[in-house]
């Protein structure tokens, strides 16, 4: 109801800070108005799940376009998203593990080459978490978000506040569940007596 659920809320802040005016008009405005939805595609099944400097998804320059190939997973909200913010390695001359090797792209969805192969099962099912295989997906230079080589910085900017928001949300839900259990145990009669 407040349009502040992940992943859209974090993507709004990211677009506000990193997007061009044209990108803000096309992606941020509809997202803020609640008529669009998004996902953030950084996590990968190999080492880049815990270290985004080691992302294997890559982008190869081809004229004024990029050809993207790779594998992402636990991508929250991908099945309902109208666009994705995707992080890919583009600077092949930069040593692996360097912070300047990755670039962020805005991907219109659906797109040819973006394959949602399955939903990854988790305890939290509100937005769903997809496994995505990217095969020869073409994007224009104008779809770069935040400039070449800034994907790691953008990702950290995006995820820092999001991690805090997730923690607040889950702690509040756990506290509410505990309060409900205490209330129930103090007022529940079973076999002629209170549980507590």
Stretches found by the model and what they are:
Residues 1-37, 76-83:
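Internal helix-loop-helix
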Residues 34-43, 87:
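A short, Trp-centered hydrophobic/proline-enriched beta-strand micro-motif
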Residues 57-59:
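A structural signal for short hydrophobic beta-strand segments in well-ordered beta-sheet cores
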């Amino acid at each position: 109801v407040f349009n502040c659920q992940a992943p859209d809320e974090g993507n709004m802040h990211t677009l506000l800070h990193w997007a061009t005016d044209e990108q803000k008009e096309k992606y941020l405005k509809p997202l803020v108005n609640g008529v669009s939805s998004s996902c953030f595609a950084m996590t990968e099944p190999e080492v880049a799940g815990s270290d985004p400097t080691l992302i294997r998804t890559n982008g190869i320059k081809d004229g004024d376009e990029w050809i993207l190939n790779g594998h992402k997973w636990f991508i929250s909200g991908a099945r309902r998203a109208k666009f994705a913010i995707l992080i890919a390695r583009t600077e092949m001359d930069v040593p692996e593990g360097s912070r300047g090797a990755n670039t962020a792209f805005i991907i219109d969805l659906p797109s040819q080459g973006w394959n949602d192969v399955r939903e990854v099962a988790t305890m939290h099912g509100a937005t769903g978490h997809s496994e995505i295989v990217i095969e020869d997906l073409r994007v224009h230079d104008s779809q770069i978000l935040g400039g070449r080589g800034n994907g790691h910085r953008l990702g950290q900017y995006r995820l820092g506040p999001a991690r805090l928001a997730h923690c607040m949300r889950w702690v509040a839900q756990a506290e509410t569940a505990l309060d409900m259990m205490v209330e129930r145990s103090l007022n529940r009669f079973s076999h002629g007596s209170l549980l507590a």
